[in-house]
């Protein structure tokens, strides 16, 4: 027995495991200290040309299709260090907790040059920028317990995927902190601390996301071996620090709204709302922006415009990141089976004939559609994306087989090459039309395919990036909306003041947001219409309350709830 214990002594020792990843490449860390400088320097406040500079920064044009990062990086997948040490049983103090999420590292020389800097680095010993107490730890336990339960408090099998639960948690947190943001004013310190703290919790899983890449290494005998080396996941490493920087820029914009020339008046009685005009009575219960009688001063107006253009750049950046993440998400299998196999069935006869006429340009098709409301624009986008998916599937199938799937030997059979070319032509025109619609309606909510991608997504990294970028885009849009209201009041007070730029959205509908610009009549009808009936006024927005036409096709935009939509197949025909 003693001999056996001696032989197994090597296995019974306590070992400390330390795994280092590319420790010799500490300098290859991506930094984002140049992002804010590029965005601010890119503004051309005196010129309305809307062109972009050669450095790749974003422009003020609503029709920009490309988004390039304004960061300076040496390596897209820079190295990082991650150490797993066995945790001792007596280490339970709050001082030893690492709950900060993504740590920030500053280089002394770069900080002296640029003033600030940040890089993504995985270090288990970094301490948070704020102090945790026992209540914070208990709140974190409660939040992660609900995430693991999949929003099913019974602990049964009705919970949602972890990715969807995490996405919903980010959305709910942003709603509780920012809400509809009816005023341009700084956030209270308690809300800012809660936003930073709980976002660190929700982003903490990304600290441990890696991908294995092949690399060569020499052993002790000099032989070259090919091994799989862990690297930071590229999409997380590139996008998350940029989103965090954009987040801080939006918070700083709100913090700067002190000692302003505008203010808000609280109208608290319905009698006062009756005396208002029709346009004002629609939102008399909300804070109303006020400006001095002569209007804003030139310096105050310029300051507001400058901040608005920076926020607009942040809005475009977050929207671009969100769209790129959605493109990487796969279409769920249940949706693939429900989408009509024919693009003509998805588009309908009228829209299909418009795309089939090659002599008509995309601009002419867009004008002929006459999309007066965002509801009509979203419905058209849903049809186009469904048809585009069907055409892509058919092109892929024909290309892999090398022949038409229903090819016949008769002379009058369709030529597979000509059919592929026709499908590609229709696909390109449909994609161009969709881009045109989104450029004219930049605040459209997610289409049906995008919403189902989020609902069925299992990739936690994609879920975090999509939800984070979406909430920041919503916040940037609300800030722009409030700025647009102030500039509108300024133009009413001073007719000589310049008109607000096109980047500021209209404030016609107080319920309009990029995620939910148009609400169903079942949600909005009772409150708004009952108030208007009591006031004896008309809103002039009856067309916004119309219910969508009932349809069994995939053209209906689904709800954000976890309820599954019952989709019926539409029989396909031989037309593309």
Curated annotation (Swiss-Prot):
Where is it made, tissue-wise? Expressed in pollen grains.
Q: Please provide an example of a Pfam family that matches this protein in its UniProt record.
A: PRONE
Q: Which keywords has UniProt assigned to this entry?
A: Cell membrane, Guanine-nucleotide releasing factor, Membrane, Phosphoprotein
Name a GO molecular-function annotation: guanyl-nucleotide exchange factor activity
Give the span(s) annotated as Disordered: 273-300, 491-520
User: Which InterPro entries has this protein been placed in?
Assistant: PRONE_dom, RopGEF
Location in or out of the cell? Cell membrane
Lineage, top-rank taxon, reads: Eukaryota
Residue ranges of every copy of the PRONE domain listed in the record: 127-500
Q: Which residues in this protein are found as Phosphothreonine?
A: 435
Alphabetical GO biological process terms: regulation of pollen tube growth
The answer to keyword Transport applying to this record is no
Bias kind Basic and acidic residues: ranges: 273-283
- What does UniProt give as GO cellular component? plasma membrane
Q: What the record says about its domains? A: The PRONE (plant-specific Rop nucleotide exchanger) domain is responsible for the GEF activity.
Whom does it interact with, and what assembly results? Interacts with ARAC11/ROP1.
Q: What does this protein do?
A: Guanine-nucleotide exchange factor (GEF) that acts as an activator of Rop (Rho of plants) GTPases by promoting the exchange of GDP for GTP.
In Swiss-Prot or TrEMBL terms, this protein is called: Rop guanine nucleotide exchange factor 14
